[in-house]
């Protein structure tokens, strides 16, 4: 019904996944489609594992009538119940309209593919009709607008392959649920090491500005720092 669901492992850790198929009715969300997504989120929560959504949807399949609105409500309910219990990660990999944007916005992390994905409530044609303004899909909900202006998007990927790689990396930083600890791995940095480089980064004059990112990358293990919302609210890290 336009969505493939299942489970697997990332670096040996179990995850649940659902992936919308634009080749089937433009990835629109019908009753069965919504029920499958809601069930996957619910199951992931009960098992205490992350859930990942690969989103590419034209929105609600309104020709199904009121039954679809009830089923879609179950997705939002499960998103809300799972919040704070398990990591919920959304990849926006194509145009996501209406309900295709609502559910990802309720999740913890959003990764958007540059140039090929958009998130908006209603499209350019409706904006033109109602407001008399002409906007493109990118201007309305592209990766740039959401990563730099609205702040909805946490990470931007250049293509689908990079998006999936980013998800793998992100999962590696997160606990499987609120009941577990984040994963640990061996590194080459000595916890008691001296960081002489900090003396060249932080100025003696407290009124002078300096790049806090350089400080963070010097302190963290192996210089590995995974930043979210890098281009939104640039005064914050």
Predicted regions and their residues:
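Long, structured ligand/cofactor-binding scaffold of large enzymes
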Residues: 1-89
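Conserved catalytic cores of soluble enzyme domains
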Residues: 55-179
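Amphipathic alpha-helical transducer elements in NTP-driven molecular machines
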Residues: 34-38, 103, 164, 213
